[in-house]
Amino acid sequence: MNSKILWKAKKFQKNKSNLFKYEKFLFSKYKFKITQNYNTLLRWSIKNPKKFWSSVWDFTRVKGIKNEKLEKSKIFYKNKFLKNSKLNFAENLLSKNDNSKAITFINESGIKKNRTWKELNRNVDKLIVFFKSIKLKEKDRVAAYLPNLIETVESFIATSAIGSIWSSC
């Protein structure tokens, strides 16, 4: 069987890709050059897992406390990368705070509702204030029986922001 390439990215498209940006980041940090070759990056990540995962954390600008500890195992999926690092999902999710669209909701009747990042942040902040007023705290559990609405997402994010555990159906 002869395989035919169906599509190939143009140079300007490659240069706008996240892989290209990550390549530039790796070169600036480690002087490692992958020249837009995925297999080169794959081999490097396997050979240097500690550097790879640390660089992914830095490149994606994760907010939190990074511990570069690596607990290796002979069984790949049992490796523990960045062990004991700490981050807050909500803090990372809500790093944007402008008027661009954050969430679009469309119900079964076709009614559409949007939230901007600014609105999402404001609503989550209000919920956090409320949750704290009722003494909800880290490791508490919140179980909800709610429909798939923007307000449900906001409640989940606010719960996560204070370190509580969210469960819904």
What are the functions of these language-model segments?
Residues G163:
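Structured binding elements
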